[in-house]
A protein has these predicted regions:
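Conserved ABC transporter NBD signature motif
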Residues: 61-68, 229-231
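H-loop/switch region of ABC-family ATPase nucleotide-binding domains
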Residues: 206-207
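A short, flexible loop at the N-terminus of ABC-type nucleotide-binding domains that lies
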Residues: 1, 10-24, 74
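Helix-to-loop junction immediately C-terminal to a conserved catalytic motif
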Residues: 53
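The feature captures the beta-strand-to-loop junction immediately N-terminal to the Walker
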Residues: 38-40
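ABC ATPase nucleotide-binding domains
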Residues: 236-264
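ABC ATPase NBD coupling module
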Residues: 15, 19, 57, 69-83, ...
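ABC ATPase C-loop
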Residues: 162-163
Length: 264
């Protein structure tokens, strides 16, 4: 479904400074796989998601989606195949538009038609049904501007908008991290429900070890621009949070030692 081969990306910061962020990432996600991605700060997790989404061109390597080489496709073209939810609830929805207008916008995107925000009766009933099923109190607020919603409600809406277009791949970049614990749990439950209902293929960045092991079917760990751990099946089931924390501390410790060597 998603196949990454030899991805490299170095950010050039001016004054001759360079920051390598991806140093040869190889990764295959099968259709319907739900992988979580952890790693210390600066490991390259968001850069990897950006490379897949086409936010920038990679320096080397290929990105394949459904067997198509999309490496040179611009972001907007890849967006027809890829849904994405960010950490910031403000990024996935348009604050000045109503809940139903946001949903209409998402549906129009999924159908590859021009944007049409006028919502008719049948469509409104369909939206109400979707939101009713979430049980987050959104169904009665179809005509309210999204700017009036709580962060959790807004993130739930962003998730529904990303899922209803039936993307071939869903990228979740710490999408529950900015929410309070109750909202975070609700949005994570909703994520699992939507993923199961639509049979989505998912790559989800998280800093929560428990989530990284218990949510989805595969756990990846990055360090210094590479995937350094890939757990699934029995290995994953046997791995406890403590074991993962220990592996994480080890890669982070190594990073600190390397940084000290560099600074020294
Ligand atoms: N636009 C950019 N310009 C310059 N450097 C960047 C840019 N984006 C990322 N980097 C650098 O690339 C490296 C990887 O960053 P990235 O944001 O992908 O890490 P991350 O694993 O997502 O970290 P975090 O968990 O803190 O979000 C870091 O050294 C970061 O400073």
């Amino acid at each position: 479904m998603l196949a990454l081969e030899g991805l490299h990306k170095t950010f050039r910061l001016g004054g001759g400074w360079e920051r390598p962020a991806l140093r040869g990432v190889d990764l295959v996600l099968q259709e319907g796989e739900f992988a979580t991605l952890i790693g210390p700060n600066g490991a390259g997790k968001s850069t990897l998601l950006n490379a897949v989404a086409g936010t920038f061109r990679v320096d080397a390597g290929t990105v394949r989606l459904d067997g198509q080489d999309v490496t040179r496709w611009p972001e907007h073209r890849r967006a027809r195949l890829i849904g994405r939810v960010f950490q910031d609830p403000l990024r996935g929805t348009a604050a000045s538009l109503t809940v139903e207008e946001n949903l209409a916008m998402a549906r129009a995107r999924g159908r590859r038609r021009s944007l049409r925000l006028a919502v008719r009766g049948r469509e409104r009933r369909l939206f109400a049904e979707w939101l009713e099923a979430l049980g987050l109190g959104l169904a009665d607020r179809l005509k309210q501007p999204v700017g009036l919603l709580s962060g959790g409600q807004r993130q739930a809406l962003a998730l529904v908008m990303a899922a209803v277009t039936r993307p071939r791949l869903l990228l979740l970049d710490e999408h529950t991290a900015a929410l309070d614990p109750a909202a975070s749990r609700q949005v994570l439950d909703l994520t699992c429900r939507l993923v199961a209902e639509h049979g989505l293929t998912v790559l989800m960045v998280t800093h929560n070890m428990e989530q990284a092991l218990r949510v989805g079917s595969r756990t990846l760990m990055m360090q210094d621009g590479r995937v350094v751990l890939d757990l699934r099946g029995d290995d994953r089931r046997r791995m406890g949070v403590e074991g993962l924390v220990e592996r994480f501390a080890r890669v982070r410790g190594q990073r600190l030692v390397e940084d000290r060597l560099l600074l020294g």
